[in-house]
Amino acid sequence: MTDRPDHIDSRVWELSETQEDWITQVHGHVRRVVECWKYTICCLISNMHTHRGAPQYDVFKWQDRSTIEWICSKKKVQYPERDTPDLYDNERAVAYKVLLVSDLSDHSPTSGIYHDLAFNLEGEAEESCALVLRGSQLQDIKGFLCRALEWVVSNNLTQEVVETISGEAKLQFSVGTTFRTLLKRDTDWDVIPTPRVEPNVPRIEGRRWTQMKKLPLLKEKEGPPSPWRALLLGADSEYIVCPPGTDQEAISWIHSQSEIECIRESKSTPASVITCLTSSLQSFAEGNPVRSRIHEDIIAFGINKKQEKKQSASSSASGEWKRAEYQVEEMSLPPWVEEEMVLLRSDQEDNWIELEKNAIYTEVDGVAEGLVDKYIEIVGRTKVASVIEKWQIAATRTFSQLHTDRSRITACPIITRDPSGNCQFWGMVLLGPHHVKRDTDNAPLLIAEIMGEDTEEKYPKHSVFSLKVEGKQFLLSLKITSFSRNKLYTFSNIRRVLIQPASIYSQVVLSRAAENNSLNLEVNPEIQLYLEGAQRGMTLYQWVRMILCLEFLMAIYNNPQMEGFLANMRRLHMSRHAMMERRQVFLPFGSRPEDKVNECIINNPIVAYLAKGWNSMPNVYY
């Protein structure tokens, strides 16, 4: 029932429509009718009554709150913070609140700041109303409420109206038999239990907690070493220096000067797809970053492959359909992780980090600028800084080209520039035909990168080519892959991995400044760490570089295994800190906090590296 009752004026009903969201409220239609009654009562009280030639009453109900607050402040009317009055008597300078109650004998004033004008459903008024209202006003109100009560009785809405005016309206909720059956269908226990009151006090059963004497070791997986599975290359990334110019001029120079020959072909990336790269290089050199399809693109981007698999599965399927299951192969820690950590923190010639300087307003801003400048000096010329810049440009350009041309091939060159303006060509990402709808949908990619060293065990899915440019030999890797939209967006902000090492560096420097009562930005103290099962020392600068390399590898290898590992390792790290402080750590009986961590060590090489680092540290503290 949503129609207007006959006893309510159409103008009042229309005005009430926008006052509240009646549809979502319990007994929303009845609540709307009751509020219309209160507004009508305000109008009947105010009806043509004057005082000194002006209206005696001001109706505040359903007016804009800011207007009410302005009028009340002007007339010095006090009211509760969230409960504005409904009516104001200019003759008596008194504010009123109009109330409807089910029983006048049980009514008590809601506030001492302004007066209540209370009426019941029969139209009877509280005794105090006779002192402030005229007989004609009371008679009009009684006649209106009698018509309202007649509508309530005829529509059998007495209970709903009483609950609404008493503020006790409750949503009636029940679970139907059909829904109850659906809930219980796949369970062995009642989803909706039957509450029972036991006559006796329930027995409390519990087992003693056990003290953790030593920290548990994590399992190190056995199996083949994990290969490089990140989107782009890491420490093996290299670039070709090109003459200064635009991206088109740099690609044109590369295309005209290069000679390509296959060295190693992988099963997942046939050598024939090199034609896709050369076609895109030629098209880009001619000023067309987007080109039409060629025959080799069908293999490189898996065009129509999904439809072929569906048709093949449908034609050969028999029996009941089941969800596909994919076994996750367990892999061990590869040796290249440690090699990446060493190579990524090696020195380079150029500075790869350029940040816009912030304005200095206070002395703290000046200290912060000095810390940032020193931090950039420490990490700006490392290999990892150059690789971060490469990933940033590649992911940003590829992400920006999603949805621009779904049916053709888009070339996204990875080009940086040195301070002298020379172009540095790292490679190219080819974005294939795609129809990405959700953030988790994958887009097909063909990635070509200049690499420094090829290892088949590390890059089994890469095909490697010899690239000769102006008599110089380079290695060119080619990989067919796909990547989701949300990960491309994440990697377009990969410069954020610089934040955590900067925070660690500033914390050490400022702690030394607090101890010595003076700031020294050149401080480079020795840091004691447990590495490879022994306590070793390294300088602060070396430590910050190592943290940056680890942050970068954790970022590019972030997946559910990494997130679960880090989340569950917090408990073990808290236990270690407590034991180092000579505090006792207790566990529930039979608890094994390392089990949840071990579940996350599967085939992520960086997770395996972190697990090995945990095992190399002491597990007993006395």
From Swiss-Prot:
Pfam family, one: Flu_PA
InterPro entries (alphabetical): PA/PA-X, PA/PA-X_sf
Cellular component, GO, one term: host cell nucleus
Superkingdom of this protein's organism: Viruses
GO biological process: viral RNA genome replication
UniProt-annotated location(s): Virion; Host nucleus
Gene Ontology molecular function: any one: RNA binding
Keyword annotations from UniProtKB, A to Z: Host nucleus, Virion
Quaternary structure note: RNA polymerase is composed of three subunits: PA, PB1 and PB2.
Family, as annotated: Belongs to the influenza viruses PA family.
Physiological role: subunit of the RNA-dependent RNA polymerase which is responsible for replication and transcription of virus RNA segments. The transcription of viral mRNAs occurs by a unique mechanism called cap-snatching. 5' methylated caps of cellular mRNAs are cleaved after 10-13 nucleotides by PA. In turn, these short capped RNAs are used as primers by PB1 for transcription of viral mRNAs. During virus replication, PB1 initiates RNA synthesis and copy vRNA into complementary RNA (cRNA) which in turn serves as a template for the production of more vRNAs.
Record-given protein name: Polymerase acidic protein
